A protein has these predicted regions:
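Acidic/His-rich structured neighborhood in mature extracellular/periplasmic domains
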Residues: 59, 68-69, 77-200, 238-241
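N-terminal low-structure segments adjacent to metalloprotease catalytic domains
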Residues: 32-129, 265-311
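N-terminal secretory signal peptides that target proteins for export/translocation
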Residues: 1-15
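Metalloprotease/metallohydrolase-associated module, dominated by Zn2+-dependent proteases
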Residues: 47, 55, 72, 128-155, ...
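Bacterial N-terminal signal peptides
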Residues: 18-30
Length: 311
């Protein structure tokens, strides 16, 4: 008697193969048109093929594509925030469609949170422990191979009043983590060894003292990438004076070399939308900063619940 058709293990393998096929099919369709690195695209509903391939929660209602890599958000998220996120990814990785496609194949997606959504509103982040901590502190998560979801807040993308991280790009930092863990480990298996060597060299030389960058190799990389794109803070409790590409090159040449290997040394730099020329805001047509809402930590429902009723 044949038992193969009822074997749960084989059924799971077939299901995974089917979902992987759907995902690869979606990537092929999404990237077939090609286009310039800075080309824009319209925000639309989440394609059903993508929703099925990634098992996306109904929470996700909006979608934009970058070389097959999905940028998604709920119905609350501003279309301009999704467009800005896609614009930043293209600015970071011109000519690196191989990296974006590898990340897409590894099921990476970028989630933009609305200004009044919080970290554990994101379906894939709901299982995080200490929900109040995450909702009170984090406006972005970098993703891992086991949980390949990168997130950031629309207030940081568009420069809303009340943005608690207004002098840096959270997206660039968190996406750098995913580039490392979900992209470079696929397309450049030797990268981790070079990163560890650069990090060990920095520690031996006493670089980045008492900063977030020196805590471990992953943060060393993500902080370095932020500064490579002039998108970091400086001279505070977690940072030294280095927050630009020129300063990274001078201060830590080995880290600069890694950044140049991955991103190139092209002129694109991050700037807040309000500080850019009109030519770099075409994808934000119709966005009026004067009408932006204000971000407030206190509006997290889990934080409010933990505080109890006010007297």
């Amino acid at each position: 008697m044949s038992w193969q058709g009822s074997d749960p293990g084989r059924s799971r393998v077939r299901l995974r193969a089917t979902l992987q096929g759907l995902l690869l099919g979606w990537i092929s369709v999404a990237t077939a048109a090609g286009g310039a690195p800075d080309s824009g695209a319209a925000v639309g509903p989440v394609p059903e093929a993508l929703r099925t391939a990634l098992k996306l929660d109904p929470f996700y209602q909006k979608h934009l594509d970058v070389e097959g890599l999905p940028v998604v958000g709920s119905a609350k998220v501003s279309d301009h925030a999704l467009a800005e996120a896609a614009w930043i990814l293209r600015g970071m990785l011109p000519g690196r469609g191989d990296l974006l496609r590898a990340m897409a194949k590894n099921k990476v997606r970028l989630v933009v949170m609305a200004f009044n959504e919080y970290t554990t509103d994101v379906p894939e982040h709901r299982r995080l422990n200490s929900k109040v901590f995450w909702d009170r502190r984090a406006r972005g998560v970098g993703g891992t191979p086991q949980d390949p979801v990168v997130s950031c807040g629309e207030e940081n993308l568009l420069g809303y009043p009340g943005d608690p991280y207004s002098t840096e790009s959270i997206l660039i930092h968190e996406f750098a983590h995913s580039i490392h863990k979900n992209g470079l480990r696929t397309v450049d298996p030797g990268f981790d060894e070079r990163l560890r060597a650069a990090y060990d060299n920095a520690k031996a030389r006493g670089l980045w003292p008492k900063t977030y960058a020196i805590t471990e190799p992953g943060e060393y990389w993500a902080e370095g990438v932020q500064s490579w794109f002039d998108a970091n803070r400086e001279n505070d409790a977690l940072h030294c004076h280095v927050n630009t590409r020129a300063e990274v090159k001078e201060y830590d040449p080995k880290l600069a070399k890694l950044c140049a290997e991955v991103f190139g040394d092209h002129p694109w730099r991050w700037r807040k939308p309000a500080d850019r020329p009109a030519s770099e805001r075409a994808h934000l047509a119709g966005f009026d900063p004067a009408r932006s809402p204000r971000f407030r930590w206190r509006e997290s429902p889990r934080r409010c619940a933990s505080s109890g009723p006010s007297g």
